[in-house]
């Protein structure tokens, strides 16, 4: 029996990492928000790896935080180990990664939603999206409750017609044994939304007491803990170690002998899996020259004996899994607590969305996270945040927030999904960003906090803290530029001691820092007027000084491409009217409906010649008007 259950500005379907950010953004920007989840105990669930961040993903978390999102703050409160990755490389690829207490991470996020003034949190299954005249009107739940709304954000994760696969055992399920959402897919199909099947998987969880750590390499956390959130200056924590081991010859033998029983190779799995996170059986088949693969043993929390076996995702039958895991050094007596599995689910072709993450053909309907064809908690949270922000901005009749590729990794992520599309679960990587030296994790606040403040997510106290940090960095760089160092005997002795050359003429301290063998920290003894600065401010100053030449080159590239990004394409344009455009280009441009020339130029199948034709047509139309 259908009944009227209430009216909301925004309804968020799903309370995973995308849904939580979407709901909190919507509520904190002043909109009455309903967030529906299949299970209140699975909010912000880490259904796979128990960590946040990593290469490129750490950048996304910093950007979410800079815009006023919650993920960085939440992991800072609930981490059990922290490490900075890629420290032997340049600052563009330095990435923070934190091991999470997954239960506490979920509980804290749930509590935030419960406490948020404008949020109503409900355990409900949405089965139908109500649309009239291409505009959302409401949602219907399995219990008959009908909620009217102005905007709907779909954050369904892997629940949409979810199907668990373990060998020849196949059954309908969401992740981690939770209920799937089997009815909503049909409603989306009825609305003309194109769905497809993707696949992901997760390794087994084992009991800590059954593991022999003496056969493994310990991986402790960093001594100096760097917070994810810019609001935290310092974090102290007793950390829990992870451990590294490897597959053995026996592991590979077991997999080869049972490969015919793998759903990946016998046709049981239809969905496309993630290229950059293959199962262990896939790795061994695809890389036969490798005699061993890394396996990471990761704790799932402080108050559990469960360990995550990173690098051994599998969908092999359970009997094969037991033998396979026990063939790994240190896991000879491993007790499996949760079996590894693959999961198939419905998701969309993200080319049906525009850069705000709203469907092109349905006003007020947005998508975020794995529903959009991405993989990963961080990618999901980033999209949820942007979808939440844009849903509210549209309701308030304000301009949308569209991040460019030169603004943020979030801009790269969304542009890739919407403009290029994806045929497999999309994972963020530093190599996807053209301007990665500008998009470092250390300067995410300098790039994005102003935007977060303008949309209303960054509050006054945090904004003032940001302005203070920005001023400190700018003032110190200016001071360094103006401070002259001369070739005094003691200074030249210091330089020779550091393996540098003597000064023949006065030089600014800023220029001196640029020498390969020196940096901001090493020249402190030459600088008796140095102000008191935080560690992150010092690091920011050092990077700006050391990499100024490279940074300026990338800024010049951004300016060159800016003319294309700023050249807006009229919404009323009819590509069929443009003589000289190839048929493929017309079809792609009609489908994706790029908002500017820059986006049009990145569409697969649209050539530079097509862009020239389009520009000439637009110039002619401008003159006529």
From Swiss-Prot:
Keywords from the named record: Cytoplasm, FAD, Flavoprotein, NAD, tRNA processing
Main location: cytoplasm
Cofactor (UniProt): FAD
Binding site for FAD: 14-19
The gene coding this protein: mnmG
GO molecular function: flavin adenine dinucleotide binding
Function summary: NAD-binding protein involved in the addition of a carboxymethylaminomethyl (cmnm) group at the wobble position (U34) of certain tRNAs, forming tRNA-cmnm(5)s(2)U34.
Assembly information from the UniProt record: Homodimer. Heterotetramer of two MnmE and two MnmG subunits.
Protein's name according to its UniProt entry: tRNA uridine 5-carboxymethylaminomethyl modification enzyme MnmG
Pfam families per UniProt: GIDA (PF01134), GIDA_C_1st (PF21680), SAM_GIDA_C (PF13932)
Positions bound to NAD(+): 273-287
Subcellular location: Cytoplasm
GO biological process entries: tRNA methylation; tRNA wobble uridine modification
NCBIfam families to which the protein is assigned, alphabetical: mnmG_gidA
Family of this protein: Belongs to the MnmG family.
Organism lineage: Bacteria, Bacillati, Bacillota, Clostridia, Eubacteriales
GO CC annotation terms, alphabetical: cytosol
Annotated SMART domains: GIDA_assoc_3
